């Protein structure tokens, strides 16, 4: 029994020496004592290849490469102890979830923390750490007693409570495992216990290579190997000079030196002979003097400079994608020009979550075979999502999001349907569920679902059309596709008495859906498209899910469990599932994490993402215990994993390992921005490299090739997939700025695409975008007639929409596009309710021959309650009755109608104007409808403007009859003559024109009428600020002022006094007008003369004719208006359709100049002056 160390700096040949010794021994004695070659898990494959890679050794039974866990498996198979069921990470998380749920009431700190994402991953890691460091539940309990007895501060009590929770959960976990199960950490403890009984290990020659430190558990294994084996050889990366001086925690080799001393101490304790250490001083790894210099002087202070040609290259990239593309281009160059194999190249990185997806995509585009040494989670696979969402449907009472997450996995679809058709139908079905607010009991009820198009509150027609009946049948058919398998599982889960029966319900759910056949179809499709990685995913995921169910049954099969806990435990297990890595092929670029990689025999290393906070790593205090808490436990004798401070001290060694892997070339790169465009800083490590290598190449990488030389641009010509975007970039430059002499070879590349049989069709769409202009071509007369008909019939809002943006008008009224209907209460719905409520009250007053002025406060409250109760069942598929939240909203709306009724009562008492009618239709046909506003357009097309007027008021005096328009609005609004001029606010003046033009035939007395004005009434329930001692009357007066109607009124003092009979001088509280003492109007009054009203009405006619002419002539320009801070695009539903983009030459706003009312009026006069 002896111990031997082989030490040396990185690249000194430690592994090579050991491998050569083993190979020579196998060559001399193929059938001797066992040779164990122990390496970290991630080194096993490459070490196995290296061991049998020589000409003399093509295979071996005597020598085997193991990790500690694989050695444990081997020994336990020999001596026994492997019969207990293994539970993987997913099983551990599921068991912990169950333990926490059952212990929840007794936990001090983790009761609420258990609901946070990642809690069970952290808890599992903490327990694994306890085991690796030989900390038992009783050790943790003793620690809690000690902490509890001496806790005085809040921080000490928190730690004591945390340790108490941990010992409870750890003890429960161990009790659940004992005699039945083994987790990954238990194998190593069993290995320690069983090594003395192993004949396979007894007398073995043991090599331990590639480790820098050992956990206490691993150190015990080393102890037993020294006792049982003939000789143990351990390699450590240490400079011999370090051993000759006192150890310092700032030394580069501090960690490995401590490991060296610990192992020697173990050997002394066991009286193991310690052979003379073999120091290796040469640097056989490095074929480059620069890399040899970097290794030899890495830790030197000040930095030792290398003045020769550096085989180190630094790349600074504009962004992460440009960085990865730069790496891909250089890899292709090395393979094409310097005869590298892909296996000679490795890419090292730390923040893989930011890079892996981009690297998979780009390396595939560049045809670079690659292997990412990182397991991917299964959580996004359709099968995992199907199970998780189906369980959420049942436990969460059939919520919309869970249902359609399950639907979108497409595993609920019948096996024999065409997926494309089913997707379209399910999209329609989802629209229905959104529009009708389908959830909860409606899914499980046997009552068929009804389909009716919602039109308006006035639509009381109960007849169903053929198209509605057809849609209703389709919806009920699709409902059954979705709900039937889930309801079957729901019933089984409710009947289930044990976890085993619940797992069986999940299994039967999958079997009845033909999931194995569907996954097989997905696998075949992936193979046919050449995506072999995803093809194997579909095989793995089924096996892992079945294994998870088996584990669940094995661990908890006979226990009873609530449905919610079963769902939580199952979800925890599913989240832990990971895809196993496919072993790398013989010729692939290896992409690995800096902290976990153990590379060898690579000629070129690319270290990417070298940004501040990443390399070296910024301190991160994460996990169950903080650094301070770990220090407290350490002081009390419980050794755990290194703290953040210790990890930071080890970071220099990690970086040293990182830059000493390659034999010939080292590339270091960093992006200056992430995928979202956020600025990133280069690491201080790059500055260090620049100081060591003054001649280092520092290249800036960008995806914009315009500023590069011709030779540099040629490197961007890679695969056809990648190069196409650069061709486009260059041709766009040529198009904008002309030929600059640097583009000639890009024309050759362009010619390849347009002449290649394979790429001609593939590239045509991309290349055609070179001449793309986001401009809507004018419709032909024939198309325009097909869309709009021979007679245009539209509302004033439609005409205003055309003037806001002709393309939006085309999308809405030509193509009939609309947003999908969602079961929610929007502003238009509330506006509709307000209008209907006030009309119902007014109609009741008319039937009773009363006016608003006759109402008492109590009657206002009663009527507002009555009408809201009448309307609520009719609005938006009974949305106000659908939930407690909407019921509360209904009460708030009733209060607004109540307040509005009180104000209308006050207005009626102060006004000579009385309502003639509400919701007055014109051009709508039927009884009581006024005629439309009609126009004959120059091209012969007839146009009718139709609509519905909120309220028409009338007043009479000795000067005649006056009519005014009141428009109810749920937000504050006034009449802006600038917007009238631009055709954006035509509604009120149109209404006034309609009623005054038809007054003689419409009103009972048959008199002509003059315009009195147009006013907006803001329906709301305002909050007012008053002094603390304000009386009720003063408060009501302030509220009344908040309802002052804005708009434009006739500049006649008598008419204004008819609107507010309390007005003598000063400003009116009812309308936007005021009188001076001399009887003239104040400057702030919004008034117009009768002649000006006539001009405005003529201008409205003029504007409608122009709009009609443009519509019928096919004008659909993408030309939204912009006026100040208002723009047509702000609330437009069609932005995704028109793709308006200000950066494009053709896409610019029509900027409308703001004007004073007097200026606008003058321009309006000029427009209609000739009419």
Swiss-Prot record:
Superkingdom of origin organism: Bacteria
Gene Ontology BP annotations: double-strand break repair via homologous recombination
Pfam families named in the record: ADDB_N (PF21445), PDDEXK_1 (PF12705), UvrD_C (PF13361)
Every UvrD-like helicase ATP-binding domain range: 1-343
Cofactor binding description: Binds 1 [4Fe-4S] cluster.
Swiss-Prot/TrEMBL cofactor(s): Mg(2+); [4Fe-4S] cluster
Binding, ATP: 8-15
Residues annotated for [4Fe-4S] cluster binding in this entry: 805, 1129, 1132, 1138
A GO MF term: metal ion binding
Domain UvrD-like helicase C-terminal stretches: 281-587
Keyword field contains Iron-sulfur: yes
Subunit structure: Heterodimer of AddA and AddB.
Name of the protein this chain belongs to: ATP-dependent helicase/deoxyribonuclease subunit B
Organism in which the protein naturally occurs: Bacillus thuringiensis (strain Al Hakam)
Underlying gene: addB
């Amino acid at each position: 029994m002896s111990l031997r160390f082989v030490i040396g700096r990185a690249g000194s040949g430690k592994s090579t020496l050991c491998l050569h010794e083993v190979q020579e021994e196998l060559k001399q004695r193929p059938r001797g004592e066992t040779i164990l070659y122990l390496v970290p898990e991630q080194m096993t494959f490459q070490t196995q290849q290296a061991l049998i890679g020589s000409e003399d050794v093509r295979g071996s039974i005597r020598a085997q490469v193991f990790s500690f866990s694989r050695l444990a498996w081997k020994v336990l198979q020999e001596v026994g102890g492997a019969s207990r069921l293994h539970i993987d990470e997913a099983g551990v998380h599921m068991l912990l979830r169950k333990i926490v749920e059952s212990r929840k009431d007794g936990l001090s700190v983790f009761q609420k923390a258990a609901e946070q994402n990642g809690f069970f991953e952290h808890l599992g890691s903490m327990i694994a750490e306890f085991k690796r460091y030989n900390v038992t539940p009783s050790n943790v309990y003793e620690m809690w007693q000690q902490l509890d007895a001496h806790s005085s501060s809040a921080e000490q009590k928190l730690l004591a409570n945390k340790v108490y929770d941990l010992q409870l959960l750890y003890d429960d976990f161990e009790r659940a495992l004992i005699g039945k199960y083994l987790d990954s950490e238990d194998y190593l403890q069993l290995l320690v216990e069983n090594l003395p009984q192993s004949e396979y290990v007894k007398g073995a020659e043991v090599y331990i290579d590639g480790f820098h430190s050992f956990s206490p558990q691993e150190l015990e294994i080393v102890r037993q190997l020294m006792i049982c084996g003939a000789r143990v050889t351990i390699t450590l990366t240490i400079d011999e000079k370090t051993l000759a001086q006192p150890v310092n925690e700032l030394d580069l080799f501090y960690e490995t030196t401590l490991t060296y001393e610990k192992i020697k101490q173990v050997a002394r304790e066991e009286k193991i002979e310690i052979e003379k250490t073999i120091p290796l001083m040469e640097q056989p790894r490095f074929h480059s003097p620069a890399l040899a210099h970097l290794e030899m002087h890495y830790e030197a202070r000040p930095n030792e400079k290398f003045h020769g040609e550096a085989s180190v290259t630094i790349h600074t990239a504009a962004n992460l994608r440009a960085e990865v593309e730069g790496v891909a281009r250089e890899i292709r160059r090395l393979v094409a020009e310097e005869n590298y194999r892909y296996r000679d190249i490795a890419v090292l990185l730390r923040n893989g979550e930011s890079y892996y997806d981009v690297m998979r995509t780009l390396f595939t585009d560049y045809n670079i075979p690659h292997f990412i040494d990182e397991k991917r989670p299964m959580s996004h696979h359709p099968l995992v999502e199907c199970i998780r969402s189906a369980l959420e449907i049942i436990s969460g009472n059939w919520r919309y999001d869970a249902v359609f997450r399950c639907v979108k996995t497409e595993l609920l679809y019948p096996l024999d349907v065409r997926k494309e058709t089913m997707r379209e139908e399910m999209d329609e079905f989802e629209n229905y569920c959104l529009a009708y607010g389908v959830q909860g009991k409606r899914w499980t009820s046997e009552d068929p679902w009804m389909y009716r198009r919602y039109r308006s509150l006035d639509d009381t027609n109960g007849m169903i059309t053929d198209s509605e009946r057809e849609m209703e049948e389709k919806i009920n058919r699709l409902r059954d596709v979705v709900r039937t398998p889930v309801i079957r599982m729901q019933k089984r889960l409710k009947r289930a008495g044990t976890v085993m029966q619940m797992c069986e319900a999940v299994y039967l759910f999958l079997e009845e859906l033909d999931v194995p056949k569907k996954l097989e179809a997905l696998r075949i499709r992936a193979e046919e498209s050449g995506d072999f990685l995803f093809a194997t995913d579909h095989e793995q995921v089924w096996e892992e899910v079945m294994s998870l169910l088996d584990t669940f049954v094995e661990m908890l099969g006979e226990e009873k469990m609530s449905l919610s806990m079963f769902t939580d435990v199952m979800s925890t297990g599913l989240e832990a599932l990971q895809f196993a890595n496919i072993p790398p092929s013989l010729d692939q670029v290896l992409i690995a994490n800096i902290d976990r990689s153990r590379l060898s025999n690579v000629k070129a290393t690319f270290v990417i993402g070298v940004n501040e906070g990443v390399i070296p790593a910024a301190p991160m205090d994460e996990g169950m215990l903080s650094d301070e808490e770990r220090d407290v436990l350490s002081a009390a004798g419980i050794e755990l994993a290194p703290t953040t401070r210790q990890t930071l001290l080890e970071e220099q060694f990690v970086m040293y390992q990182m830059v000493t892997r390659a034999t010939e070339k080292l590339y270091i790169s960093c992006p200056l921005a992430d995928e979202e465009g956020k600025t990133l800083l280069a690491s201080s490590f790059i500055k260090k490299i620049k100081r060591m290598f003054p001649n280092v190449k520092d290249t800036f990488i960008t995806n914009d090739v315009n500023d590069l030389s011709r030779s540099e641009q040629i490197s961007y010509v890679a695969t056809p997939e990648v190069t196409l975007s650069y061709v486009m970039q260059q041709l766009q430059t040529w198009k904008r700025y002309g030929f600059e002499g640097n583009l000639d070879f890009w024309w050759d590349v362009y010619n390849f695409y347009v002449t290649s049989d394979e790429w001609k069709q593939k590239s045509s769409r991309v290349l055609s975008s070179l001449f793309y202009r986001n401009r809507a071509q004018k419709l032909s007369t024939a198309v325009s007639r097909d869309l709009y008909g021979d007679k245009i019939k539209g509302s004033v809002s439609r005409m205003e929409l055309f003037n806001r943006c002709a393309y939006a008008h085309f999308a809405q009224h030509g193509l009939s596009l609309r947003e999908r209907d969602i079961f929610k209460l929007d502003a238009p719905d509330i506006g509709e309710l307000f209008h209907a409520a006030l009309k119902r009250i007014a109609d009741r007053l008319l039937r009773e021959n009363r006016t608003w002025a006759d109402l008492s406060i109590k009657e206002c409250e009663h009527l507002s309650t009555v009408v809201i109760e009448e309307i609520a069942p009719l609005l938006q598929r009974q949305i106000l009755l659908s939930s407690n939240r909407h019921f509360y909203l209904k009460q708030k709306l009733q209060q607004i109608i109540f307040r509005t009724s009180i104000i209308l009562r006050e207005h009626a008492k102060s006004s000579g104007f009385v309502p003639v009618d509400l919701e007055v239709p014109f051009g709508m046909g039927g009884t009581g409808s006024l005629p439309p506003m009609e126009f004959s357009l120059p091209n012969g097309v007839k146009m009718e403007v139709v609509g519905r007027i909120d309220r028409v008021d009338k007043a009479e005096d000795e000067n005649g009859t006056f009519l005014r328009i009141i428009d109810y609005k749920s937000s504050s609004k006034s009449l802006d003559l600038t917007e009238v001029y631009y055709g954006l606010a035509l509604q009120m003046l149109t209404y006034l024109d309609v009623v005054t033009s038809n007054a003689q035939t419409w009103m009972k007395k048959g008199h002509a009428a003059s315009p009195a004005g147009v006013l907006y009434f803001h329906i709301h329930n305002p909050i007012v600020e008053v002094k603390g001692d304000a009386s009720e009357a003063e408060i009501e007066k302030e509220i009344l002022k908040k309802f002052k109607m804005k708009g434009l009124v006739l500049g006649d003092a008598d008419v204004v006094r008819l609107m507010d009979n309390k007005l003598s001088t000063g400003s009116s509280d009812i309308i936007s007008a005021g009188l001076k003492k001399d009887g003239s109007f104040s400057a702030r009054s919004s008034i117009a003369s009768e002649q000006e009203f006539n001009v405005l009405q003529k201008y409205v006619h003029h504007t409608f004719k122009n709009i009609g002419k443009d519509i019928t002539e096919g004008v659909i320009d993408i030309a939204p208006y912009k006026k100040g801070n208002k723009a047509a695009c702000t609330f437009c539903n069609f932005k995704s359709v028109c793709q308006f983009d200000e950066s494009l030459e053709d896409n610019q706003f029509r900027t409308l100049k703001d004007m004073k009312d007097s200026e606008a009026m003058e321009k309006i006069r000029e427009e209609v002056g000739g009419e």
